[in-house]
Regions:
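Ubiquitin-like/PB1-type beta-grasp interaction modules and other compact soluble beta-rich domains
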Residues: 1-60
Length: 61
């Protein structure tokens, strides 16, 4: 399974990043996803041995 790090915690799963994040109780649009130092879209499909860092973003005025 792929490893996704969110707010200092690790989660495992295979599938679309946004769907996995939602299943773990996070709002997928609130994060930027980084794989191997490169930003990737939230609809990226991840699988075995891949690593993703989810970085919380802030917006507003």
């Amino acid at each position: 399974m792929a490893d996704v790090k969110v707010a200092g915690r690790s989660f495992s799963g295979n599938g679309r990043i946004d769907e996995l994040m939602q299943s773990w109780g996070f709002y997928p649009d609130s994060y930027l996803y980084i794989m191997e130092g490169v930003p990737v879209p939230s609809d990226t499909v991840i699988s075995d041995d891949e690593k993703v860092d989810a970085v919380r973003v802030a917006s507003g005025g």
